């Protein structure tokens, strides 16, 4: 066993040495801590801990659970200097990591960032460590990391009004659904500013703030203003007061190069662009900014003129690609379309090529779909992107097959593959859906094995366009609907949530980043009634990400079957699973407590867009002392 593990151990030591030498930020307080949503600023979600191995992971047991009192939990807990931080509902909690005992809590009175908090370690002026999170009133609050008290000398009595420094309709919605990121003494925010109707609202500017005072330091206009580069990609004045085009998901920091990478969403309205003809920069872009000044370094637009709600939903992941013996600093971006793009971190050049391919065009009056869309040459899409009604229906039972066939025939459904636009006279089916493919759960990266891991869905969506009889001011003339009179319909049985397409419905996928080839893929999740009939490799829809460890383990929840699992990073073999009280639509984390015990923690909140049974708990797992010593 020692000989088998030795190569990973040697590589791990070299990685740690190179990272420590390159980083101008303060070093981690404890090696076993998890200091940001992605553990490190580059969102690799990789842990160097080695106590839990392939040989003993089956012995993991629940050691504590903390009830947040809130449902639909999506946050990844942080553990820093002996405290765990997590959000739920309107509350930020600090817990004792060893036991789950509450140390303090801060109740904002309205919803806080549902995906957690950002941590700043303080600075040389003796300003103590702080936490930053959003509040649903459109504000960001700073808390003392030790006590949970509002830091009153930050902003206005501890708060920044994020609406006031953004031009546009200040009455529009604004929220930090995902936590900000921190570079040195700068807190960098994106935000959720409305994606539906009307099309106008607050701009989705990316901004940098002084971590001590809350002073605005810089802004990057995700919708260019008059005279700025990119404004020519908007027809006429359609850029004015345009909402959406925002970094609502996680951002990533390259500390060594002083870069922040931001994935942006689609411009409003999500499903009709007749009032915003053009490519619509910087919508649906991966943007690299100077983290100190906010100046644009480079960008790549991955969807032109989006009318599918195919935001870039996930944190860009910093990786290294080895080519001809040379290590290239790279950044990987998963999309809702399940395409995986890999770029040179410094220049933005695609490392495995990009092709502009013709795509179907819309026949909705006034719409002007872009004639081509970008596809990576490698790897291929990670999820289903086509559907053939002659052979791809799931014929599990006569009843299910009849339900899906009737749905198809009654609503005159059709598909032309990925990027099929919704029409007026029939209902389109396209794969993936607005849930992905990939989503905010994103990637984890194993720098030892040179692979990224992601959980994807093979779930289609159905929709058609409908002309509004009396559109509200600022609303587009056409809106998207479905057989269920919702803007988005899933291509599944509404009662059972079993998709109409053949399985697998959800998968865990590993990609070799040095060759951009799929290393392995396995079904992820089970439907209980199908499992009882012997169909236990169907996978399920899922939402919630992966982490990986130096011992070659991949941990993932996400599925609607309430399971939490561990897989072999090399082969994709499942090594462990447990059943939670609710599905875990969140990304796990792992840390080493003060007693030298490695724990794995996940939020099991259910609910969400997959309509899972709700839960309210943060759950921790560890090995027994006898298993740890084995």
Q: What kind of region is each of these model predictions?
A:
Residues 43-126, 133-156, 160-163, 549:
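N-terminal cofactor/phosphate-binding cores enriched in small/glycine residues
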Residues 63, 101-104, 151-152, 217-218, ...:
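A structural motif specific to WD40 beta-propellers
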Residues 23-50, 370-383, 388-399, 473, ...:
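N-terminal pre-domain segments of enzymes
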Residues 65-76, 105-126, 156-181, 221-250, ...:
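Extracytoplasmic beta-rich repeat domains
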Residues 31-38, 70-89, 112-139, 172-198, ...:
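Repeat-blade elements of multi-bladed beta-propeller folds
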Residues 143, 203-215, 279-294, 344-347, ...:
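Beta-propeller blade signature
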Residues 315-364:
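Phosphate/diphosphate-binding loops
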Residues 91, 97, 114-118, 122, ...:
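Hydrophobic or amphipathic alpha-helical targeting/insertion segments
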């Amino acid at each position: 066993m020692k000989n088998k593990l030795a190569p990973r151990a040697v590589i791990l030591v070299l990685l740690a040495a190179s990272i420590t030498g390159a980083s101008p930020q303060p070093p981690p307080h404890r090696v076993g801590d998890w200091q940001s949503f992605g553990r490190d600023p580059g969102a690799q979600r990789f842990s160097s801990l080695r106590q839990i191995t392939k040989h003993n992971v089956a012995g993991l047991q629940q050691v504590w659970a903390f009830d947040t009192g809130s449902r639909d939990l999506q946050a990844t807990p942080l553990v820093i200097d002996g405290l765990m931080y997590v959000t739920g509902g309107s509350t930020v909690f600090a817990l004792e990591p060893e036991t789950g005992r509450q140390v303090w809590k801060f109740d904002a009175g309205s919803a806080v960032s549902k995906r957690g908090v950002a941590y700043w370690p303080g600075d040389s002026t003796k300003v103590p460590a702080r936490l930053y999170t959003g509040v649903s009133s459109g504000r960001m609050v700073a808390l003392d990391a030790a006590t949970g008290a509002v830091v009153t000398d930050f902003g206005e009595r501890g708060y920044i009004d994020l609406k006031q420094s953004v031009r546009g309709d200040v009455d529009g919605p604004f929220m930090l659904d995902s936590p900000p990121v921190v570079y040195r003494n700068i807190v960098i925010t994106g935000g959720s500013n409305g994606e539906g109707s009307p099309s106008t609202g607050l701009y989705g500017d990316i901004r940098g703030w002084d971590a001590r005072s809350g002073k605005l330091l810089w802004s990057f206009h995700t919708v260019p203003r008059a005279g700025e580069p990119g404004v020519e990609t908007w027809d006429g004045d359609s850029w004015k007061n345009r909402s959406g085009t925002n970094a609502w998901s996680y951002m990533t920091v390259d500390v060594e190069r002083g870069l922040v990478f931001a994935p942006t969403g689609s411009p409003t309205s999500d499903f009709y662009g007749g009032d915003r003809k053009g490519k619509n920069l910087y919508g649906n872009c991966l943007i690299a900014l100077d983290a100190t000044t906010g100046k644009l370094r480079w960008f790549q637009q991955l969807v032109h003129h989006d009318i599918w709600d195919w935001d870039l939903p996930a944190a860009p992941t910093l990786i290294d690609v080895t080519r001809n013996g040379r290590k290239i600093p790279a950044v990987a971006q998963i999309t809702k379309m399940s395409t995986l793009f890999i770029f040179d971190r410094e220049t933005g050049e695609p490392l495995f090529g990009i092709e502009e391919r013709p795509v179907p065009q819309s026949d909705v009056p006034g719409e002007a779909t872009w004639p081509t869309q970008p596809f990576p040459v490698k790897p291929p899409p990670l999820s289903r992107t086509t559907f053939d009604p002659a052979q791809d229906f799931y014929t599990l039972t006569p009843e299910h097959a009849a339900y899906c066939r009737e749905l198809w025939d009654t609503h005159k459904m059709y598909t032309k593959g990925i990027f099929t636009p919704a029409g007026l006279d029939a209902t389109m089916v396209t794969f993936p859906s607005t849930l992905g493919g990939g989503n905010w759960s994103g990637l984890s990266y194993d720098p030892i094995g040179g692979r990224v891991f992601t959980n994807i869905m093979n779930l289609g969506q159905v929709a058609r366009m409908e002309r509004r009889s009396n559109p509200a001011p600022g609303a587009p003339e056409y809106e998207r609907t479905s057989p269920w009179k919702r803007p988005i319909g899933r291509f599944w049985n509404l009662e059972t949530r079993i998709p109409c397409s053949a399985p697998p419905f959800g998968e865990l996928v590993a990609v070799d980043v040095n060759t951009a080839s799929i290393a392995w893929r396995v079904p992820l999740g089970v439907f209980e009634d199908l499992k009882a009939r012997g169909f236990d490799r169907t996978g399920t829809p899922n939402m919630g990400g992966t982490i990986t460890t130096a011992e070659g383990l991949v941990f993932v929840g996400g599925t609607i079957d309430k399971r939490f699992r561990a897989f072999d990073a090399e082969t994709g073999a499942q090594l462990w699973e447990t059943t939670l009280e609710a599905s875990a639509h969140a990304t796990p984390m792992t840390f080493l407590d003060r007693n030298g015990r490695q724990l794995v923690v996940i939020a099991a909140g259910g609910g969400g867009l997959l309509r899972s049974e709700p839960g309210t708990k943060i759950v921790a797992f560890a090995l027994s002392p006898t298993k740890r010593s084995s």
